């Protein structure tokens, strides 16, 4: 994000001198520039952040422990602990829509558009997700209007659906993707079938959806095991 938030200005005291400044409106407070040591004059520093701007850091800095989830990052543990939590049983799909990813960023205003579009078809949002915590009305997906213009590296709309609802959700995402001023990727979480197949593959192939080879797998090493 460093290259995308730089702004060049003339020094008002020495007009022949051009200085580099950070566009505070575009900065998502990810702290990558600080950790990278990219400034040769060591001019970068972390200002004190107040609410609602502190939300940018909570959602963007992977080393910042989010106060709502008490884990680093902007999401939940989702399938990574499913063998113990049992959040994703057979017959259900967990879905996560990562607004602003990869590398573009998003404002909560766009996250709200996606959430509200899904709420119209009866989607309920994951209770422990940090974005859900910002909703003032979870039945409609409406987010606190005071934070809508805050920009973050990404924000995740997370929910659980029955398998048969996937085509309808994809229809909604096709529509709302043309209404937001950012990009997003979709994640689907499910138990692999007993024959080793993935239950949603055929649905996505029929729609010519790109499926990344990258993913997360839970191999069931936790204890005690949940009945899923």
Task: Please give the residue ranges for each predicted region.
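Iron-sulfur cluster-binding cysteine motifs and their immediate structural context
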Residues: 1-52
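Long, contiguous binding/interaction regions
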Residues: 21, 28, 56-91, 115-119, ...
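Extended, surface-exposed interaction regions
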Residues: 58, 96-99, 111
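Short glycine-/aliphatic-rich beta-strand segments at the starts of folded cytosolic domains
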Residues: 92-101, 155
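Short, conserved charged micro-motifs
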Residues: 105-110, 163-172
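Short amphipathic alpha-helix segments
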Residues: 110-140
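C-terminal edge-of-domain segments
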Residues: 150-162
